[in-house]
Amino acid sequence: MNTVATAATTTDLPTRREALVFACKAWGLRALRALRDAADPGRPRRHPRANTLAQAPALAEFDSPLWPGEEVDPMLVAGKLQNLRQALKRLDGIEVAPGARFGFWKQVGRATRRRGYAIGRELREGCLIPAIGGGLCQLSNALYDGAVRAGLTVLERHRHSRVLPGSLAEQDRDATVFWNYLDLRLCAPFAWRLEVEMDAQRLRLRIRGHRDVDAVSWPMAVSPRRPATPSNDCGSCGQYECHRHTGPSTGRLRRLWWLQEAWPEFSAALAAGRGEDDRVFGPGGRRFPAQAPWRRAAQSLSWRYGRWRGRALPQVRLAQLRAHARDLAGQLQLQDLDLVLPQSLLPFLWRDGELAGRRYAVLMTALPMRVLQDELDAAVRRHPQVRSLRDFRADETLIADEWQALQAAETWWSPHARVLAMAGERGRALSWAMPAAVPASGRASAGARPRLFFPASPLARKGILELLEAVRDRDVEILLPPGDSERGLDPGRATLRRVDSYRHGLLQADGVVLPAWVEHQPRALLGAIAAGLPVVATPACGLPASLPWTPVEAGDVEGLRRALRTLSMGG
């Protein structure tokens, strides 16, 4: 039996007149609070983000679920998550100086639609009603609880008007907020830092600082339980004649796909997992905002201008990725709680707080940046004279943001064996799309000396230096595809020859070799395997053990030489 509906029958229904009186009182109290704050030189100020106390000890932590146990209207929870997401952007990472006052509303600002807030549940005059900014009390409850545990001074705090079963109000650990006259205000004689985060299921709050060791520690005292009071839910109370009654929301939660990199493996995953209500951007779905004609023209001009001003190519590329991330964020709606995202946009979305409260899978197109740079650093130690190995070095903050976002992801989708090994239980293995085999009739006949195809630009990170060292004393021909090249390559007795395309390289080769330090899309190796050619490659190429190929470790010249000799490929 619905206890909420039963309670509703024993209480008088709220009237429009009462709602008008409440609104007038609220605006009067808001004006009074504004006047008092204007006259108070010690009123709360907005506090900036900082990292001074990022490594300080945690004084208090709080953890609470985001989804109620018996939820009848998930759209209102989605609205609450959107409201928490917006508030976290103003709260996470702030640091408050000793003696400075913290005010919840001064820091967060008013919750309005224009500022990105949505309709969630709000407890007002005994009823749970849909309201803009509803659900922020879960954050104020957490902040009050953590503040008391951390030894902060509570300057202002208000209890909820009703006690919901199972809530912190039963233990007198709650703090309601209502713009702007019901506030939560804190201060402390020591500097303190606030960290707030949420994943798809839980809200977590942490307060850091260096409190005086002689100060009294505040474990939260166990207060007598306040009795729960009946509260009506406007979505399910069944009082249809009430002017507040809305009924359950008609919207449904859904998944959003953003296929920035149209790998065939990702397209196959979309075809297999696309739901009826899913929104898809990219191949098979809607056009990306950046594909609008005016955006294409603007991007081209921005690219040329950046290069003309001398900006490095990676910087220009990062600027474009930031723009794409803003496009994605602009398309997100509150019911989009399940996302499939490209790895390239992940750090920007994480930094902007758009992934908080959402479950997401990542389409992995490369190794994580921190791992990629470790691989390149290993190559630099072997070839310190090669400048191209130092090209890719991302900003430390960007690397950290990507790694944190990857750790919070539900799954990593990839066909790359190395990426899947790193993902562990998070990994979702996709099968490499095997290309059509080159026709045997077009293959060149064996020549007097072996022909090895190197299926990548002859750069140090692709292993060209190791290959040349392995065959230096052998009479072999190395076929190179079009593309950039290291300068001053010395093949020894071997010879280098350019071919017109990757296809021509496969048609003329006796074997394919790629001892790469880094390789994210081994399409040419897959083509060689499909054609039945012997393949020697490193695990960095991401080929699965189920395919026929010979592994060698990156940088292992002697191992490469043995593998080539075993396969009669010129080693």
Regions flagged by a language model, labelled:
Residues 237-242, 250-301, 472:
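N-terminal subdomain of nucleotide-sugar transferases
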Residues 305-311, 362-398:
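Acceptor-binding helix/loop patch of EC 2.4 sugar-transfer enzymes
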Residues 392-429:
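A short, active-site helix/loop in glycosyltransferases that binds the activated sugar's phosphate group
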Residues 438-462, 468-473, 479:
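Conserved donor-binding/catalytic core segment of Leloir-type glycosyltransferases
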Residues 517:
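Aromatic "clamp/platform" in nucleotide-sugar-dependent glycosyltransferases that forms part
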Residues 549-558, 565-570:
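Conserved acidic donor-binding segment of nucleotide-sugar-dependent glycosyltransferases
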